[in-house]
Design a protein with these regions (language model features):
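Flexible, glycine-/basic-rich loop-and-beta segments that form/coincide
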Residues: 120-166
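Glycine-rich adenosine-cofactor-binding loop
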Residues: 179-195
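A conserved beta-strand element that flanks and buttresses the S-adenosyl-L-methionine
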Residues: 37-40
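Class I SAM-dependent methyltransferase SAM/SAH-binding core
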Residues: 1-27, 195
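Short, glycine-/aromatic-enriched active-site segment of Class I SAM-dependent methyltransferases
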Residues: 68-93, 97-100, 104
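A short glycine-rich, Lys/Arg-flanked "PGG" loop and its adjoining helix->strand segment in the class I
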Residues: 52-69
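Conserved S-adenosyl-L-methionine
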Residues: 109-120
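Hydrophobic adenine-recognition pocket in adenosine-nucleotide-binding enzymes
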Residues: 44
């Protein structure tokens, strides 16, 4: 929650509830506004401790054949592209498509489409529908198949990734040390992009 932006939004006619989404907020929204045809969420789920409660609440807020489109960080891209700097202390989790599809199915969603984009180093965008037993599309099956191929030797990739991070750190240390030895003045400034 962010009090000032919520106040500004409400003053400008954008109905904003300045609370974390939970069952109480879900009940309040449903009582005040009813159910929805479409709900969207973009790169906020990594900050949520209880994803099950949020996804169930979202499911319950949708009309019988409503849609939910959400975006989450894609851990495959984080590893593949060495984007260790996209990992922040506020992020509680990172995702792969296959376990998300299984998780969504248990709640009652059918996944219609999965795509990747370059947002935040690589994100998954998933479109699902509040309707059980919709046949999984060729596109979703192909995405899951390709992800599965990438996951072969996953533990080796994680270990390689750790070595790559340490290599980057050591290269930076050597560079700074060399500049100091050359008589250069070295200054550092750190500012996380999302904290």
């Amino acid at each position: 929650p962010a009090k000032l932006p919520a106040e500004i939004a409400n003053k400008n006619g954008i109905n904003t509830i300045n609370k974390f989404f939970d069952i109480n907020v879900k009940n309040f929204i449903e009582k005040k506004y009813g159910k929805f045809d479409f709900i969207t969420s973009h790169n906020v789920l990594a900050h949520i401790e209880n994803n099950l409660e949020v996804f169930k609440g979202t499911y319950e807020l949708l009309n019988d054949k409503g849609y939910f489109c959400f975006e989450v960080g894609y851990f495959v891209k984080v590893i593949k592209n060495n984007y260790f700097d996209t990992i922040y202390h506020e992020h509680l989790d990172y995702h792969h498509a296959k376990p998300l599809v299984s998780f969504l199915k248990k709640i009652g969603f059918s996944v219609l489409f999965i795509t990747q984009n370059k947002i935040q180093g690589g994100s998954l965008r998933i479109l699902c529908r509040k309707q059980r037993n919709i046949k999984i599309s060729k596109q979703v099956n192909k995405f899951l198949f390709n992800e599965n191929k990438l996951m072969i030797n996953y533990s080796k990739k994680i270990m390689f990734w750790e070595r790559k991070i340490n290599e980057n750190l050591n290269n930076l240390k050597r560079y700074i040390k060399q500049k100091k030895m050359d008589g250069r003045i070295v200054a550092g400034y750190g500012a996380p992009t999302k904290a």
